[in-house]
């Protein structure tokens, strides 16, 4: 029985961390954050509330990251700044410079939750959670591209290999350019232990 996480992307959620968008997205500039012309912070807040309600109704406990007017608009996407294993969390380093400070929020939250931190990706390495996919409990695929580089993959491998976890790097297609930011999870969505929804034309 794991104490801190699950090395699976198909099992039911039991505990998650989330952040409210109300304050952090209120003043977000569309062009700066690449949100597109249809971005509406009020609507984003409403939709996030519905999403959080669905997560809670699924039976998962939600721990809320400290709220604040810190301008970290993307911090509501809590999957990216850290990776949780059965033994604890790994603090990642964001490839999008506007998101670098989000990792400290995750570190603070894990400390409050008594979740141990196994390591941290340091410069010049970058790894974002959206580029990490658990193939099985002992295999982590990591997409190398705009937001995750080889130095980050090497550091992540050094942290996880002592736990018996193989880290497999793969090249991601650029597709529509760097600003579009294609993550590995944009291509692969695990549905069950032996089933995934994939976009074959872009599959590494």
Spans of model-derived segments:
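The feature marks the mature, well-folded catalytic cores of soluble enzymes
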Residues: 1-204
């Amino acid at each position: 029985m794991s104490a801190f996480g699950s090395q699976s992307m198909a099992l039911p959620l039991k505990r998650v961390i989330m952040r409210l968008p109300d304050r952090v997205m209120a003043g977000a500039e569309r062009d700066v954050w690449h949100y597109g012309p249809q971005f509406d912070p009020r609507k984003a807040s409403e939709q996030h509330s519905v999403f959080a309600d669905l997560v809670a109704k699924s039976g998962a406990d939600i721990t809320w990251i400290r709220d604040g007017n810190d301008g970290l608009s993307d911090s509501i996407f809590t999957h990216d700044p850290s990776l949780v294993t059965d033994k604890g969390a790994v603090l990642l380093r964001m490839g999008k410079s506007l998101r670098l400070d989000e990792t400290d929020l995750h570190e603070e939250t894990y400390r409050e939750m008594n979740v141990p931190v196994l390591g941290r990706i340091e410069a010049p390495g970058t790894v974002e959670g959206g580029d990490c996919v658990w193939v099985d409990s002992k295999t982590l695929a990591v997409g190398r591209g705009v937001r995750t580089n080889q130095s980050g993959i090497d550091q992540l491998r050094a942290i996880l290999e002592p736990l018996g976890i193989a880290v497999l790097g793969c090249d991601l297609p650029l597709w529509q350019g760097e600003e579009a930011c294609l993550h590995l999870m944009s291509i692969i969505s695990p549905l069950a232990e032996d089933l995934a929804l994939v976009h074959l034309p872009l599959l590494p």
